[in-house]
Each structure stands twice: as C-alpha cells, then as structure tokens.
Amino acid sequence: MRVVILGSGVVGVSTAWYLAQAGHDVTVIDRQPEPALETSAGNAGQISPGYAAPWAAPGIPLKAIKWMFQRHAPLAIRPDFTTAQLCWMWQMLLNCDARHYKTNKARMVRLAEYSRDCLQQLRRDTGIQYEGRQGGTLQLFRTEQQYDNATRDIAVLEEAGVPYQLLARHELASVEPALANIVGTLTGGLRLPHDETGDCQLFTRQLAAMAAEAGVTFKLGRNVRQLRVEGQSVTGVQCDDEMIVADAYVMACGSYSTGLLRQWFDIPVYPLKGYSLTIPLADDASAPVSTVLDETYKVAITRFDNRIRVGGMAEVVGFNTDLNPKRRETLEMVVRDLYPHCGPIEQATFWTGLRPMTPDGTPLVGRSPLKNLYLNTGHGTLGWTMACGSGKLLADILSDKSPEIEADDLSVSRYTR
C-alpha cells in the first residue's frame, strides 16, 4: 500500500520506519529541509514512561492561578481569547479531577511502556546510536508535600507493573553523586530505574537514514498546502505545485495538524510551548548520570555524551516561537542550583519548540473520521518517550493487524462519543 506521512519529526519518522518494515511504500513530506528540525530538535532528552502524566491533574487550576504571580512558574497562560484556545483550556479543566487523572495517566503509561519496549527492540535489531543511556531517571522533591503526593503516582506505577524506588533525602547521592552537596535542600525523590535518555534529534535522523535505505522516500522542503478530500476519503496532498497521491495518509504534523484538518473535522491538539538549554559538558563528576527532574519547576536535566540538556516550562501562547529571556533565567536558575559546575552555562544554546498537546494528555493514535486518513499526533511533552510505540501501533492499525496493546482509547473518537 502507498502511504504518505505528513511530518518528519520523531513520531513521523518512527511511523515511516514501522510502515516500511510492514511492507508499505512510504513517502514522508515535511516543509523543513531535514528531519527533526522543529519540536524534535531540542527536547529534554528523557524517555520516561513512568513519569508519563497529564498536565491536567487535581489542583492544577489553583496552581495555575498562583503561578501567574511567580517569576519561575512552570506553566504560563497568555489568553488570546480565540475559540481554539478557550475550548482547549475548558476541555483540559474538565480533566483536572482524580478520576480523569487516573484514567489518563494509566493509558499514557501503557503507551509509553510499550514504546520503550519497541525502542529497545529497535536498538537490538539495528544497533542505532543516539547518545542513549539506560541509567533510569530521578524525580526530585523540594517539599514534604511533593514527597507525600508521590503516592498517587506510585499507585498507577504499581498497577502497570513499573519498577520504582522512593528515595529519602540521604539516598539521593547514591543514585546521582553530583547532588551530594545540595541534598539538604531536598526532601527525597522517586527513581524509575528502567527509564532511558538520548538525543531525540540524533535518533530521528539516524532512523530516517535507515528508513531511506529501506525504501522510504523523503520529500523535504515541501510546504503542505492542503489535503484534497472527496466524499469521506483523502485523494491527495497538495504540496506547492505538486499533488502527491497515495492509498492512505498519516497526519503527524504535531501542533500544525489541527489547522490542516480543520476544514473536515476538529482535533483537540494545541501547542504547548517549551524551552531548553544545551550546555557544553565541563566536568563529568559535576554532571548528572542520567536525567534528573525537578518537580517544583518541571525542569529536566539530562546528560548526553558531551552536553547537558536542560528542558522544561510550558506556555499556552498559541504558535508564538519567540525566545522568552525569562524562561532562560528559570532554566539557568535550576541548573545552577542542582549542578552549578556541570559546564559553562553562559555558552548554552537556547531553544524553543511547540509540543502538540491534547487536553487529557493522551495522544491521538489511530483512525480518523476520513476513511483513509490516520492520526499520530498530540503527544505533548512525551513525543520522544512515545514515538516508537506510537509508530508501531499506527503501522499495525493501518495494516489491519491486531495491536499489541489496547488502542481504542487512544483514537480521536474519545472526544466525539
């Protein structure tokens, strides 16, 4: 079957790989000249299934109000009063209760755990290299309340069979030695020993090269103008002056998927702006071993081979991609506090990207209201964590194979029931 994939980020390229492995004739289209030049370019680098959780959680509405008056708040909302933003925020608000949180987190962990398994199998099969580490991740708590609240997430981890370690303050340095001098300011941590890290952009480009060798065609530097639809089926993709025709189509354009589909149906995917710093590594002993997550500021600090990636923050500001210097100040503040000697922070590269977020945090993976159009978008802050699993799952659905995990609650139909 001829399949066209719109989007060459980590989700689109992963989907292309698995579809090619299933025997399909695959073409990937993207406006950028190379894969992984937008949201996949500078993310925090962690592959953290156990930490997969929706931003829509109990207490978030009140916290969001408080954060409006804090300099280093992890979430910032700039209302533009557009229908798209207001509807998305209202749907998110409806998911901010314990029942929805438990349901949403459980299915996010399910997909993320499956994705980690798919990544590990891919690594065994191909030997793909992307500065990956399998050292687990450590979530740091600065308050007793955060430590106590961890029990809510632990219950979901136990139900999903995810190994974990709840660490007291004095145990943190045994996992991350460079924290030894500042553990007195922390209350403890939650460690997930099976989590991983790696450079998402490097992975995507390596996988794209392997996909090309396997027969995938990449049409890069092509602007997708619109889908051509007749009846209930897509009949082509208009790219500049070329119409590209296939039997099936996959929408993996992240935050831009919503606009491309609006003429035919709505999907609740909205951009959540994030930031990162990439710092040259100066001292191994002063750097994290793997990934450390600061629960207070929602910032992740990840070790690559010769670099430190500091990523986080969330801004609801539409499609604005300006680099906000205040967000850089927050990222610098966190890394100076936890790892002050890891590298020359003043030499850091500052980056921003738009994560495609659904109100309930769970991506849209599966069929759409159009017969031959499939969705693989809305992964939010977890595109890297969920990419391989989402790609394999979508390939199975498109190929009419039984998915290896439950998939019905991952489709867009959950918003139309």
From Swiss-Prot:
Protein name, per record: D-amino acid dehydrogenase
Entry EC number(s): 1.4.99.-
Chain's role: Oxidative deamination of D-amino acids.
Keywords recorded for this protein, A-Z: FAD, Flavoprotein, Oxidoreductase
Gene: dadA
GO terms (BP aspect): D-alanine catabolic process
Cross-referenced InterPro entries: DadA (IPR023080), FAD-dep_OxRdtase (IPR006076), FAD/NAD-bd_sf (IPR036188)
Residues the record lists as binding FAD: 3-17
GO molecular function, one term: D-amino-acid dehydrogenase activity
Family: Belongs to the DadA oxidoreductase family.
Biochemical pathway: Amino-acid degradation; D-alanine degradation; NH(3) and pyruvate from D-alanine: step 1/1
One Gene Ontology cellular component: cytoplasm
Catalytic activity: a D-alpha-amino acid + A + H2O = a 2-oxocarboxylate + AH2 + NH4(+)
Cofactor(s) this protein requires: FAD
Organism: Pectobacterium atrosepticum (strain SCRI 1043 / ATCC BAA-672)
